[in-house]
Amino acid sequence: SLIHLSDKYFASPLEEEIQWYLDSRGIEGRPKPPLWRTPNPPERVDGQPVRFNPKAVDRVIKTIGCLKHTKGRWAGKPLELSATQIAYIIAPLFGWQVWNELAGRWIRLRREVFIEMPRKGSTLASAVAMTMAFGDGEGGAEVIIGAASRDQAKACFQPLHDLATYSPLLQKAGVKTVTNEIRQPKTSSVIKVVSSRG
């Protein structure tokens, strides 16, 4: 249920809840729909209700805003998300929740995500990875980032390394960088970068 290639998912309109979120938070700009997008969530999953939680989206946006650019003219400035990034990546991924009877609480509906980013999009992908691994309140979280070659894997890892190294928020949370991994020992959570060619 991540990305479907059928016609009904090509540039389909935003869910009412996400449009309401953008309007209620005063997020300016018209989101540009991607070619493919995550389908609208069902009303129920395995008999359990699904809801949109705007506070969860607020928390993620605030967390990402605590991270800072590490390169170029924006180096040292907080990450700011565009309306498109919020509407089509952050809100659908973190806002939709399903009731989990076993945990006795609402959990994120989307447990897996595929985000294809063009070149120069690694900062957003890194921020989402950091949030999923260390800011989601889940012990033992694993985020795997794949690349075709060692050089690509290194290029994927560098922005993650830089965010972790230069973020007081992540340092305070005990996040450590090691070879090709970023770990939070107290929660056993990890981000790994792997390549298909060794």
Listing of model-derived features with the role each one plays in the protein:
Residues 1-198:
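Phosphate/NTP-binding elements of NTP-utilizing enzymes
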